[in-house]
């Protein structure tokens, strides 16, 4: 038997049927799905050095299980003391099984470790069915060794869905188990 991550199995066996039932799709191909998860981590340019960049890349690689790349600035910006070609952020795009494994670890392990966590903001959709989640500290992930961590950067996690409507995407992420804030738990 082949390995299948828990959220992917859940999607195939239960979520598709619940989405068809709720939104009355005529075909299984109309059902929205999670296309990719993009993790972006900005780096403070003022403390930039190669060691900082390499540590940040190693941390994101440990969290996601996939090698991260750095993004370079496109132009000079004197207000930020930024030069063209300077690394300003790190990103990694997750697809297929690695995406589902990361989603499982995020929902079941990392988010419950956030101090005073009451749920994620339900208004962070972009109007195209994509959801953005900001995390202020990367130490919520158990893969990060807090003893050797010098710079604790935050990160932005974007869930890209095939849905074009926020309502459908929100219900899809809710069925995956993403804990949205409700009036009860605030």
Curated annotation (Swiss-Prot):
Part of the 50S ribosomal subunit; part of the 5S rRNA/L5/L18/L25 subcomplex. Contacts the 5S rRNA and the P site tRNA. Forms a bridge to the 30S subunit in the 70S ribosome. GO terms for molecular function: rRNA binding; structural constituent of ribosome; tRNA binding. The keyword Plastid does not apply. This is Large ribosomal subunit protein uL5. Signal peptide: none annotated. Pfam families: Ribosomal_L5 (PF00281), Ribosomal_L5_C (PF00673). SUPFAM superfamilies: RL5-like. GO terms for cellular component: ribonucleoprotein complex; ribosome. The gene is rplE. Keywords: Ribonucleoprotein, Ribosomal protein, RNA-binding, rRNA-binding, tRNA-binding. This is one of the proteins that bind and probably mediate the attachment of the 5S RNA into the large ribosomal subunit, where it forms part of the central protuberance. In the 70S ribosome it contacts protein S13 of the 30S subunit (bridge B1b), connecting the 2 subunits; this bridge is implicated in subunit movement. Contacts the P site tRNA; the 5S rRNA and some of its associated proteins might help stabilize positioning of ribosome-bound tRNAs. NCBIfam families: PRK00010.1 (NF000585). It comes from Karelsulcia muelleri (strain GWSS). It comes from the Bacteria. HAMAP family: Ribosomal_uL5_B. InterPro entries: Ribosomal_uL5 (IPR002132), Ribosomal_uL5_bac-type (IPR020930), Ribosomal_uL5_C (IPR031309), Ribosomal_uL5_dom_sf (IPR022803), Ribosomal_uL5_N (IPR031310). GO terms for biological process: translation. Belongs to the universal ribosomal protein uL5 family.
């Amino acid at each position: 038997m082949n390995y299948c991550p828990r959220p992917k199995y859940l999607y195939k066996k239960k979520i598709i049927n619940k989405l068809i039932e709720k939104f009355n799709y005529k075909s299984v191909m109309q059902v929205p799905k999670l296309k990719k998860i993009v993790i972006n981590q900005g780096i403070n340019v003022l403390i930039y050095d190669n060691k900082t960049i390499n540590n940040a890349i190693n941390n994101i690689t440990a969290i996601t299980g996939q090698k991260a790349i750095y993004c370079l600035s496109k132009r000079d910006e004197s207000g930020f003391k930024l030069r063209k070609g300077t690394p300003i952020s790190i990103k990694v795009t997750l697809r297929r099984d690695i995406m589902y494994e990361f989603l499982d670890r995020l929902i079941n392990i990392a988010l419950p470790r956030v101090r005073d966590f009451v749920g994620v903001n339900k208004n962070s959709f972009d109007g195209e069915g994509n959801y953005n989640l900001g995390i202020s500290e990367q130490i919520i992930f158990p893969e990060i060794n807090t003893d050797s961590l010098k710079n604790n950067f935050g990160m932005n996690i974007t869930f890209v869905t095939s849905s074009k409507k926020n309502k459908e995407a929100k219900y899809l992420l809710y069925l995956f188990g993403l804990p949205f804030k409700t009036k009860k738990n605030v």
